[in-house]
Amino acid sequence: MRNMTTKQPRKQRKALADAPWHRRRKLMSAHLSTEYLEERKRKLPRAVPVREGDIVRVIRGEYRGREGKVASVNYRSLRITIDGLTYAKADKKQVAKPVHPSNVIIKKLDETDPLRLRRFEGAKK
């Protein structure tokens, strides 16, 4: 898949549906909160791919303002699920609500993976 040069919505949707996994990972990025960037006092990128265990806050949509830990990341549907974000089905069963990562801000990174943190050491702010 080459870089996008078309304006046609049909081709934009097709490119997203057929995107390879390394591009999907990039599409699963969310901005870091300004408070977290100031608190860390080290150079971090503005946006990083969301992972399970990150603490995020929803900033757009029906669940705006809600915070929680990322429960799962689905690269196939390009959605994440957050602990505590559920909706009721017709049979009253509670189901996790999928959210697009562009609608959240990362409040705190999951710091259990030292390789992930080392990768950001030389990143621009």
Cite the ranges covered by each PLM segment.
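Residue-level "contact hotspot" at macromolecular interaction interfaces
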Residues: 46-49, 61-64, 98
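Structured, basic alpha/beta domains of bacterial-type, RNA-associated proteins
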Residues: 67-123
